[in-house]
């Protein structure tokens, strides 16, 4: 098994910590909030308010299940438009009250079903991209598993984007890439090598800002490392003038 194939396998492993695991272990007094106030509450996106040390923050994540029943309830971590609208509602609330936003991302992509399209999946993702680019509080996004397509990017227009060591971040799945390029989804590993989807490759290209080393899926070291980096980075981001913060975020994505 090549290194890329191993990382792809580990990124998708059902045993990985979920967004709710990180929310409960890194933050204090996490309180989950529900619903987009327009259509429904999407279980594939979770979010709420919490404390990071003594700092109030908004935490949002894409939640995969740990077993079949849980995955069905979470739609296998593939958000509907109401999930993205819930996330945006929480981000705008964070902006109103001056709370930094931290997102945890693990998705193969946004749900492509007919109902999702009819309810405006593309519009929901596009609006998140637009609103996050100008959100007037610090944003940090962390890839904790798969970072697939616009479904991941809709929570990743951030001042800092981090990845765990054995995760992936790509414009589409390697299987989708192989199917489009070669009409053969079985060549996914070959596609992944061409796509440059690993944390090390993306860090080298400047797409992400930090790699979090992994020592097993459930590691107190990972949790403490993320918590420490979050405290330090949010302190630095909050110290910047708002105009500088927003300009740097804009320029960060313009260079792609």
From Swiss-Prot:
Pathway in which this enzyme or protein is active: Lipid metabolism; malonyl-CoA biosynthesis; malonyl-CoA from acetyl-CoA: step 1/1
Cellular component, GO, one term: acetyl-CoA carboxylase complex
Subcellular location: Cytoplasm
GO biological process: fatty acid biosynthetic process; malonyl-CoA biosynthetic process
Record-linked Gene3D superfamilies: 2-enoyl-CoA Hydratase, Chain A, domain 1
PROSITE patterns per UniProt: COA_CT_CTER
Residue ranges of domain CoA carboxyltransferase C-terminal in the record: 1-236
Short name of one Pfam family: ACCA
Key words, A-Z: ATP-binding, Cytoplasm, Fatty acid biosynthesis, Fatty acid metabolism, Lipid biosynthesis, Lipid metabolism, Nucleotide-binding, Transferase
EC number of the protein: 2.1.3.15
Annotated InterPro entries: Acetyl_CoA_COase_a_su, ClpP/crotonase-like_dom_sf, COA_CT_C
A GO term for molecular function: ATP binding
Coiled-coil region list: none
Catalysed conversion reaction: N(6)-carboxybiotinyl-L-lysyl-[protein] + acetyl-CoA = N(6)-biotinyl-L-lysyl-[protein] + malonyl-CoA
Enzyme class: transferase
UniProt similarity note: Belongs to the AccA family.
Functional description taken from the UniProt entry: Component of the acetyl coenzyme A carboxylase (ACC) complex. First, biotin carboxylase catalyzes the carboxylation of biotin on its carrier protein (BCCP) and then the CO(2) group is transferred by the carboxyltransferase to acetyl-CoA to form malonyl-CoA.
PANTHER family: ACETYL-COENZYME A CARBOXYLASE CARBOXYL TRANSFERASE SUBUNIT ALPHA, ACETYL-COENZYME A CARBOXYLASE CARBOXYL TRANSFERASE SUBUNIT ALPHA, CHLOROPLASTIC
Quaternary structure (record): Acetyl-CoA carboxylase is a heterohexamer composed of biotin carboxyl carrier protein (AccB), biotin carboxylase (AccC) and two subunits each of ACCase subunit alpha (AccA) and ACCase subunit beta (AccD).
Protein name as it appears in the record: Acetyl-coenzyme A carboxylase carboxyl transferase subunit alpha
Organism: Streptococcus equi subsp. equi (strain 4047)
Source species taxonomy: Bacteria, Bacillati, Bacillota, Bacilli, Lactobacillales
């Amino acid at each position: 098994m090549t290194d890329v194939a191993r990382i792809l396998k580990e990124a998708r492993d059902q045993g990985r910590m979920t967004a709710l695991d990180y929310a409960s272990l890194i933050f204090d007094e996490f309180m989950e909030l529900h619903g987009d106030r327009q259509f429904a509450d999407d279980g594939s996106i979770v979010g709420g308010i919490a404390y990071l040390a003594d700092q109030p923050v908004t935490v949002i994540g894409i939640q995969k299940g740990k077993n079949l029943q849980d995955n069905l309830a979470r739609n296998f971590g593939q958000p509907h438009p109401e999930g993205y609208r819930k996330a945006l509602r929480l981000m705008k609330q964070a902006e109103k009250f001056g709370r930094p936003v931290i997102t945890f991302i693990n998705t193969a992509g946004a749900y492509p079903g007919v109902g999702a399209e009819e309810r405006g999946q593309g519009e929901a993702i596009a609006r998140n991209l637009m609103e996050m680019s100008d959100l007037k509080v610090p944003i940090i996004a962390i890839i904790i598993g798969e970072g697939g397509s616009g479904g991941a990017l809709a929570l990743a227009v951030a001042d800092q984007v981090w990845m765990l060591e054995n995760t992936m971040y790509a414009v589409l799945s390697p299987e989708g890439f192989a199917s489009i390029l070669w009409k053969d989804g079985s060549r996914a590993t070959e596609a992944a090598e061409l796509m440059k989807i690993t944390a090390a490759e993306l860090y080298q290209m400047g797409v992400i800002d930090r790699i979090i080393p992994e020592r097993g899926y459930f590691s107190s070291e990972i949790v403490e490392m993320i918590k420490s980096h979050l405290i330090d980075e949010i302190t630095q981001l909050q110290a910047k003038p708002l105009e500088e913060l927003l300009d740097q975020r804009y320029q960060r994505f313009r260079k792609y």
